[in-house]
Amino acid sequence: VFANPYAENFQFGYDYNDVKLDPNTQFLKTNETPKILYLDNSEDIYDYLSEGYIPIGSANFVSNAASEQQVIQQAKKVKAKLVLVQKQLLDQSLELKNVSERSTNQWFYNIESVFLVKDESYKQGSLGIIVGELPQELTKKYQRNTGVVVFLVYKNSPAYRANLLRNDVITKINSRDVWEDNFLTVLNDEKRKSNNVILSILRDGVDKKIPVTLGW
């Protein structure tokens, strides 16, 4: 019996226990079949994160024989609804000789896989984005400490409908400066005044103002 590389190399994410205990988390049910999708580009994962999928673990390894049945088996074990797999052919093949002295080439792949569950609690938010502190390269690029970078825009959210994009930098909500620590406080303060707010953003170095109607 061949070992399952997806099981042997699987690691739960650091926040798995929080995800597991969250009543909003939707795990794979006993009668369900997990979806297995193959990505060409690692950036494509954001398309699925924006639909409310969240990672619970991953398995990364090199193999010449990993099968789809094996990834399905591991997905069922950890109750993942979706697995995103990226395969990259390694530059060199390995020459093997069988008992009859015939040479065969074995092609090996670098395989990266992410196991995900669903959580639609993001629809309870008023804006529908995930933001964080400006990374060092943006702090240096824009010569500023304040502001937040948009890591994710949920599909069909108020931010999505207003055409806010991933990697935009939000500098103000209405006339108030924002940064990671005060962003939610300012957003909630301004929402109490009106569901219509103006976001000042930096996109590719250009200042823009985007009107957003808060709430789903």
Language-model-detected regions and their locations in the chain:
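Short, well-ordered alpha-helical segments
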Residues: 53-94, 164-166
